Structure formats: structure tokens, C-alpha cells
Amino acid sequence: MAKFQDKLISDGYCDNRGAGFCATATSLPRGEYGFVALCVKGSNLNLYDVDMKSNVGELLYEVDLKQISNLKIKSGFFSQILKFENNGSVYSFTNFVGVKPALKVIEEEANNK
């Protein structure tokens, strides 16, 4: 995971806090789902399409973390869930592990209103 985060930083997808990781999108505003990269840059959470070889593709969404509501981060035995709302749309992600520092950055930015 660290190599991928280093690549996200060096390629400019996320800032030097390294809050970037891949997850499975289970709910996005236009109905997309699948493998995405979540990258925090400043106070924005940018969502990028990612292929199965971890190649980052097009920018799908740019979300101002200061504008999100109903942030939920749940940790279970087998998986974690990240879910929030923005402008009336629900964003939901699962199938990510070992990203507690990145989730902490998301939570801090969301609470920094």
C-alpha cells in the first residue's frame, strides 16, 4: 500500500499527508460502482477511476470535505465502510484495509468546517 500512496503523492493526486487509497465504490451520484482511488488534496476528496492494475484514470468526482454530511466510518471484522452525503447524493465505499491514517485525514477535514 505504501508504494501506491507514494505514487499518488509523486503524481500529484494527493497531498503530502498521503491520504490516498483504493476502495470499491458501492454508491456514487451517477450510479457508478467499482474500483476507485480516493485521494485527499487540501480539503478536497477526489475520486478517480482505477483499473485492476492500480492505474489511475479519469477524475470522477471532486468533493469538498467541508461540505459533506452524515460521515460514517465503520470497521467490521471482515471489512470497513466509508459513507457520506454531499449535495443530496450518497457516496459509499468498502473493501479497503490498512488505511486508518487516511481515514483520519478525511475525518479531520470534514470536521474542520
Stretches found by the model and what they are:
Residues 1-42:
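Anionic N-terminal interaction surfaces
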Residues 2, 19, 82, 91-94:
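Short non-domain terminal segments
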Residues 3, 72-73, 88, 98:
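N-terminal functional modules and adjacent low-complexity/disordered segments of proteins
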Residues 28-37, 41-87:
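Phosphoinositide-binding peripheral membrane targeting modules
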Residues 88-105:
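Canonical phosphoinositide-binding patch of PH/PH-like domains
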Residues 108-113:
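Short acidic DE-rich linear segments
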